[in-house]
UniProtKB/Swiss-Prot annotation:
One of its GO terms (biological process) is dipeptide transmembrane transport. It comes from the Eukaryota. Its main location: endoplasmic reticulum. Gene3D superfamilies: MFS general substrate transporter like domains. The chain crosses the membrane at residues 65-87, 104-124, 136-156, 160-180, 192-212, 224-244, 292-312, 333-353, 357-377, 384-404, 416-436, 450-470. Keywords: Endoplasmic reticulum, Golgi apparatus, Membrane, Transmembrane, Transmembrane helix, Transport. It is found in: Endoplasmic reticulum; Golgi apparatus; Membrane. This is Uncharacterized transporter C417.10. It is a multi-pass membrane protein.
Length: 508
């Protein structure tokens, strides 16, 4: 029986086609080498779970962990929208911003995010997940409270630090989703917790509108927005610590039997729930996997428009559509409702359309139509409708989050793929605000045209990723039919990558 070493496979991932019998040498099966669920898996049989028992277990998870995830994602998005509201509530005047200075306030946040994304993800892998998320969120809340500064350099410095602290949120939630849910359940759950960005925008609009109308405040309204958001973030940090366990085997709300059922459910994912040790070979494999770079390019292209519209939406509505400050703040309500309702509807659509790349294409086409209306439509109401259509653009990012959860196997590989995707997210959001030049105000036509081009280019990446995964699944099915793949009991809990575990199939 021949064996394929990791080094050989990294040199030529397709080399497995030339082997008579495929039995991957997984090497380290010590406690450091295997998944956290491995010991539980040894005591768990392969019998099917009773459907009613499984529904009861999923309800427990949905009612305990999932609401906290949704609320945290809601509050962390408030920071992004707060900057957009603050700029029309006196931020630029108070901090004496001129030219591109406001653009840099958006770029600075994602610069910090970019710099700290990989260290944050390593910390999430190395240390207990919920406790690490708690620390990041509490520090982020304190920094947010301090954002009510009196000068521009201090504001920019805090924006960088805020980006560094927020860099743990998305990768942490991707890992949590993979820890608790089957692949068939991940798309809907990811859609819902990302949709709470929309609820964050609704809350932010209401808060900003209420503060803008008040004339007797102890300080400027834009400063109070940051302080309120910071206090909420600190509170939710401690809620995570109290409610969310580090992994299913430490879950206070599950019985011992329920914990074993979690392991049995996750067998279908062909991957485990976590390993605290960084594995260099999995990192190398990630860097040589073409899927990583297709997703990276997709992320950059998707988020150039996101970075621009997230920072400049209020200025666009006020400057080109003829609304005053209070009306502009209220326009955030329907925008948030479109995002919240649209993304949840998109999540339920995934129950009927099982090809994830098709879902990503649909939402990006809607965003492309919205960007065209924003760029080329004359009437202000048509432009506003285009802006609201852009609110469903995170649907494609949701698909990619779910793809990372379900298709990147091996804990170090999953973390690394998530990091590279989010680095692309940062790069796009760094570039986005810089496309809005002060000289182009108030229409910002070059920036709007850039949005159209980016969404159009993104549509090329989805069929490319689909084809790569479809081709590999077809090849593995052929090898299995020829009896060239040897099944390993509990292989899904040995912390194998998707290259190593040839029983693994990619979600399309």
């Amino acid at each position: 029986m021949s064996s394929i070493s990791i080094d050989e496979k990294l040199k030529d991932p397709e080399s497995v086609q030339n082997k008579e019998i495929l039995d991957v040498d997984v090497g380290d099966l010590s406690p450091k080498g295997v998944d956290a669920a491995f010991n539980y898996a040894l005591d768990v049989d392969y019998d099917e779970i009773d459907p009613e028992t499984e529904r009861r277990l999923v309800r427990k998870i949905d009612c305990t962990i999932f609401p906290v995830m949704c609320l945290v994602y809601c509050i962390q998005f408030l920071d992004k929208t707060s900057n957009s509201y603050a700029v029309i509530m006196g931020l630029k005047e108070d901090l004496k911003m001129e030219g591109q200075m406001y653009s840099w306030s958006g770029t600075a946040f994602y610069l910090g995010y970019l710099v700290f994304e990989f260290p944050a993800s390593l910390l999430l892998q190395r240390f207990p997940l919920s406790k690490t998320l708690c620390v990041f969120l509490v520090i982020w809340g304190f920094l947010l409270c301090m954002t009510s500064v009196a000068n521009y350099p201090g504001f920019i410095a805090l924006r960088v630090l805020l980006g560094m602290m927020e860099s743990a949120a998305s990768p942490g939630f991707i890992l949590l989703t993979a820890q608790w849910y089957k692949r068939s359940e991940q798309q809907l759950r990811t859609s819902v917790w990302v949709a709470f960005n929309g609820l964050g925008q609704i809350l932010g609009s209401c808060m900003a509108y209420g503060l803008a109308k008040r004339t007797s405040l102890p300080m400027r309204g834009w400063k109070l927005i940051f302080i309120i958001c910071g206090v909420l973030a600190i509170f939710l940090g401690f809620v995570i610590l109290a409610v969310v366990p580090d992994n299913p085997f430490k879950a206070w709300f599950l019985t011992e039997e329920d914990r074993k059922l979690v392991v049995k459910r996750l067998r279908a994912n062909k991957q485990g729930v976590g390993n605290n040790h960084f594995k260099l070979y999995q990192f190398k494999e990630t860097m040589l996997d073409i899927r990583t770079w297709i997703m990276f390019v997709s992320s950059v292209l998707l988020n150039i428009p996101n970075g621009g519209i997230g920072t400049f939406s209020s200025l666009l509505i006020k400057g080109t559509m003829g609304y005053d400050t209070l009306q502009t703040l209220l326009m955030g309500l329907p925008a948030g409702a479109c995002e919240f309702g649209g993304l949840i509807a998109f999540g339920f659509l995934s129950l009927f359309i099982h090809k994830r790349m098709v879902l990503a294409t649909i939402t990006t086409c809607i965003a492309l139509i919205g960007s065209c209306l924003l760029s080329f439509a004359g009437p202000p109401r048509a432009q506003l409708a285009g802006y609201y259509l852009l609110m469903v653009s995170p649907g494609a990012m949701i698909v990619m989050f779910a793809i990372i959860s379900s298709n990147a196997s091996g804990y170090t590989k999953k973390v690394t793929v998530g990091v590279i995707y989010l680095i692309g997210y940062c790069v796009g959001n760094l570039i986005g605000p810089q496309t809005f030049k002060a000289a182009d105000a108030p229409e910002y036509m070059p920036a709007k045209n850039t949005m159209v081009g980016c969404y159009a280019a993104t549509l090329v990446t989805f069929p490319a990723l689909y084809y790569v995964n479809w081709r590999e699944n077809k090849r593995r099915d052929q090898l299995a039919a020829e009896g060239k793949i040897e099944h390993r009991p509990n292989a899904e809990f040995e912390d194998l990558t998707d290259f190593e575990n040839l029983d693994f199939r990619y979600t399309l």
